[in-house]
Amino acid sequence: TDRIPEFIALAEARFNRLLRIRAMEEKQTASTVAAQRNLALPTGFIQMRNLQMNTDPIRPMQYVTPEIYDRLYGGSVSGTPEMYTIVADEIQLGPIPANVQTIEMLFYKKFDALTAVDTTNWMITNAPDVYLYGCLLEAEPFVMNDPRVQLWATAFQQSIKDIQEQDNRDRHSGSALRVMNTSGYY
């Protein structure tokens, strides 16, 4: 029983790698610093969905690879950021901000970890089966060749699949999908 917190942490790491659902989305704003290109990634960051300058009008920022970023903005060009890349735990803005501006990030964030103090989160409330089967899978090396391990693996994979599919259905419910020309909006 001493290892149960370890099994929980390992199960959380596993489903944080597998899922990208609305319950994991977080929106935060940050202020740029004049003449400084880097911003720290938010705590719990997994993956960016959208990054924009909150100007009037709002200006979406384009992601580029670090290599392209270095070719375009490797020097000291300053102005209003239009592009960004992610290196290690930082967002690099290009061109380098000439003044203080507000950016808004929509990103996937890890679920809050369960602890002795924080005993609930979205996953344990809405999909406790993911925790159960994930913890059983992580405990398997210690229970030594339990014949139910394949059952646990299948149940875990099915639970993850069900959550992702439900989120996909919910995300696009309410109206028909359609192609939209957004060129006049920017």
Which residue ranges define each predicted feature?
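Glycine-enriched, solvent-exposed interface loops adjoining structured elements
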Residues: 1-186
